[in-house]
Amino acid sequence: MANEIIIVEGKSDSQKLKKIYGENLITFETNGLGIDDKKLNSIKELSKKNKIIIFTDPDGPGKKIRETIIEFLDVDVFNAFVSKQDIDKNSKKIGLAEASEEAIKKALDNLITYNKKNISISWDEYVKNDFYIKANRIIIANHFNLSEDMSSKSLFKWLNWMNLKVKDIEKIIGE
């Protein structure tokens, strides 16, 4: 994972990844929702020479951190996702550090590129094709290991960030 920096929420996430991939892995910790302008500017500087991978927890704060970073950067951002189902059932926390090694490797092997400048689907297309309906949102969310609770507006934004077209989304729903 040379020239890659994985953005995580905390120390336990970094420790988990380094246990799997070795101590040479480079992570950047946001300290949860404590991500501020100084950290965002540090990530922006790092993005000039490195591939940025966001790997946050599969919960509300993780989603918020991910959105904050993507909206701040002017480059492609790579995203790794684990689902809540990948978390140890005995854990009280829903975090990356509690995910299985297999789930973490699968997530990092299947990165999704986001770019905030993408506009691949209009709101009219989104509504006309019933992508906003909860049942369809859940199918789409599960396909990408996103939260099933994601709002219609958030999913619309994220589908554009992924540069998905109507036919791509129809294929996902039809699977």
UniProtKB/Swiss-Prot annotation:
GO terms for cellular component: cytoplasm. Residues 3-83 form the Toprim domain. Mg(2+) 1 binds at E9, D57. Keywords: Cytoplasm, Endonuclease, Hydrolase, Magnesium, Metal-binding, Nuclease, Ribosome biogenesis, RNA-binding, rRNA processing, rRNA-binding. Binds two Mg(2+) per subunit. This is Ribonuclease M5. Its EC number is 3.1.26.8. It catalyses: Endonucleolytic cleavage of RNA, removing 21 and 42 nucleotides, respectively, from the 5'- and 3'-termini of a 5S-rRNA precursor. Its cofactor is Mg(2+). One of its GO terms (biological process) is rRNA processing. Mg(2+) 2 binds at D57, D59. It is found in: Cytoplasm. Belongs to the ribonuclease M5 family. One of its GO terms (molecular function) is rRNA binding. It comes from Mesoplasma florum (strain ATCC 33453 / NBRC 100688 / NCTC 11704 / L1). Its main location: cytoplasm. Required for correct processing of both the 5' and 3' ends of 5S rRNA precursor. Cleaves both sides of a double-stranded region yielding mature 5S rRNA in one step. SUPFAM superfamilies: Toprim domain. InterPro entries: RNase_M5 (IPR004466), RNase_M5_C (IPR025156), TOPRIM_dom (IPR006171).
